[in-house]
């Protein structure tokens, strides 16, 4: 199993919630885990907001100094080589769209030596603005890759409507995810289900997720 997982996606795709779940899952399996908050674009949904959770689970957090405020964010500094060597599972949560992926691009050269040990997941949500079709999410994916100077390896279907998410909504999104897979040539590695809905599906790619990230207006 490759131990470096890079998570990208459109704003509101749910990539941060997925990243948090990946880290918690790794820790529950007895692995040493670290999560890098590279989201220096969106002040509302950041992995750094879950510092207490990570401390409880023994997960190492690397984040910008002001990641828990609404201030402009300075560039984040971390030793990606050291983290990759020290941790069983290293998760890098990248900012939304190509603008957020620019920060990842700064580490592309350092990450190159771990190329065979990296999985780069593209998180998609059909129920979000500007990502309703496979063509739209495919175009955005290539823009992210250009900014990041790295290529994705798989797709994560995280289609949801927040608290209104149902089994039907997720199952209906499978054709959208499959078409995205066809256009990009990448496999759909996971389909994310809220943990209370996950047992209702008989599919093989189910990823049960707890909802950690909630809207600031909720």
Model-derived features: where do they sit?
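Hydrophobic anchor at the beta1->P-loop junction of P-loop NTPases
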Residues: 7
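Walker A (P-loop) phosphate-binding loop of P-loop NTPases
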Residues: 12
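Conserved lysine of the Walker
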Residues: 15
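Hydrophobic positions on the alpha1 helix immediately C-terminal to the Walker A/P-loop
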Residues: 18, 22
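N-terminal phosphate/diphosphate-binding loop that engages ATP/GTP or pyrophosphate donors
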Residues: 25-73, 79
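Switch II (G3) loop of P-loop NTPases
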Residues: 64-69, 88-104
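Loop/turn-to-beta-strand initiation segments
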Residues: 86-90, 118-119
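Conserved catalytic-core segment of NTP-binding enzymes
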Residues: 99-203, 216
């Amino acid at each position: 199993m490759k131990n470096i997982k890079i998570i990208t996606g459109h704003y509101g795709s749910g990539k941060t919630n997925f990243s948090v779940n990946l880290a918690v899952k790794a820790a529950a399996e007895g692995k040493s885990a670290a999560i890098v908050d590279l989201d220096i674009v969106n002040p509302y949904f950041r992995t750094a907001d879950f510092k207490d959770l990570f401390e409880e689970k023994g997960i190492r957090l690397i984040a910008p100094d002001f990641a828990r405020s609404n201030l402009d964010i300075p560039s984040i500094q971390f030793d990606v080589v050291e983290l990759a060597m020290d941790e069983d599972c290293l998760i890098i949560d990248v900012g939304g769209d190509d603008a957020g992926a620019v920060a990842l691009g700064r580490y592309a050269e350092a990450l190159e030596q771990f190329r065979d040990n990296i999985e780069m997941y593209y998180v998609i949500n059909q129920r979000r603005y500007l990502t309703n079709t496979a063509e739209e999410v495919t175009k955005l994916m290539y823009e992210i890759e250009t900014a990041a100077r790295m290529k994705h390896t798989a797709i994560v279907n995280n289609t949801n409507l927040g608290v209104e998410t149902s089994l039907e909504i997720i199952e209906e999104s499978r054709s959208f995810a499959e078409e995205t897979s066809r256009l990009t040539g990448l496999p759909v590695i996971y389909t994310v289900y809220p943990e209370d809905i996950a047992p209702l599906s008989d599919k093989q790619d189910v990823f049960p997720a707890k909802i950690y990230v909630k809207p600031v207006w909720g």
